């Protein structure tokens, strides 16, 4: 028997193992250290950073510096451990996958949908955000019923909670989905839509940057408001989530989160008096 035969036999045996064996081993290895233990050891907190998403994220192309409400909140959380903030550029859609693959420790803002909760963990809400719309000149809707009319053309970005709201509360309208919020704005500006469904923080920021789109209109009857949370890795050790939850409770209580959000909106030209009272931080 040649020397190479046992090696070939071993290689064949390894090749015959199912792919799930390696996936399971990889997950077991990555799960051996909890988020809290890793942050404590490395003194680094990895944040999902989404460029071009004020008031939460804004990146200066010239300097590479980040600013925005999410940056300030993440710095505050990192300071609990005396840790440095590590920016991992991604998108809102990919941030869930990044948490699952242990590329990041925290991502926000994310709405805790049941589907997302199957894949990742969530902290307590740091914001409760009402929904409303931007409307064409001369059209001033006040309730969802005002949009739920067959002659009206309603725009929303596909796959978002804006779409969920439109289909649930304005099913009789002419509903059109677009790939991005920017395309919805273009439809509104060009007269191809009568209103665009959009969350308050995003809508306020858009009006701050381009006042001709305003005013932003909150819609009632019913009031639709959804929590915004921090997404975290799903793991049996809950100590990291417990610490972040405590940070949220404390900083909401003393008004720090509200101040951070107001400062983030100011990056888009939004003044405090433009922020509706039902938008709670």
Q: What are the functions of these language-model segments?
A:
Residues 2-3, 9-28:
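N-terminal export signals
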Residues 42-51, 145-161, 174, 249:
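Short loop->beta-strand "edge-of-pocket" segments that line small-molecule binding or catalytic clefts
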Residues 51, 128-138, 200, 208-248, ...:
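Periplasmic-binding protein-like
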Residues 68-80, 139, 145, 151-153, ...:
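Extended ligand-binding regions for polar small-molecule ligands
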Residues 83, 87, 91-93, 111-116, ...:
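A conserved helix-loop-strand patch within extracytoplasmic ligand-binding domains
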């Amino acid at each position: 028997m040649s020397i190479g035969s046992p090696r070939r036999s071993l290689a064949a045996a390894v090749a015959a193992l199912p792919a799930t064996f390696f996936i399971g081993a990889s997950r077991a290895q990555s799960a051996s250290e909890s988020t809290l233990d890793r942050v404590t050891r490395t003194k680094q907190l990895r944040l999902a950073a989404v460029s071009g998403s004020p008031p939460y994220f804004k990146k200066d192309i010239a300097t590479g510096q980040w600013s925005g409400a999410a940056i300030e909140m993440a710095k505050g959380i990192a300071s609990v451990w005396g840790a440095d903030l590590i920016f991992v550029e991604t998108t809102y859609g990919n941030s869930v996958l990044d948490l699952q693959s242990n590329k990041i420790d925290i991502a926000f803002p994310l709405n805790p949908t049941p589907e997302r909760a199957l894949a990742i963990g969530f902290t307590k809400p740091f914001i409760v955000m009402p929904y409303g719309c931007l409307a064409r000149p001369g059209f001033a809707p006040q309730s969802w019923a005002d949009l739920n009319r067959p002659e009206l053309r309603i725009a929303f970005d596909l796959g978002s909670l804006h779409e969920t709201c439109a289909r649930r509360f304005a099913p009789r309208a002419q509903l059109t989905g677009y790939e991005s919020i920017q395309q919805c704005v273009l439809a509104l500006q060009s007269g191809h839509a009568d209103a665009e469904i959009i969350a308050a923080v995003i809508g306020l920021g858009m009006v701050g940057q381009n006042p001709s789109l305003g005013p932003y209109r909150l819609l009632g009857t019913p009031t639709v408001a959804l929590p915004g949370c921090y997404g975290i890795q799903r793991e049996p050790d809950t100590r990291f989530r417990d610490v972040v939850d405590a940070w949220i409770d404390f900083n909401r209580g003393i008004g720090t989160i509200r101040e951070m959000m107001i400062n983030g909106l100011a990056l888009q030209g939004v003044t405090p008096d433009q922020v509706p009272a039902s938008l709670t931080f």
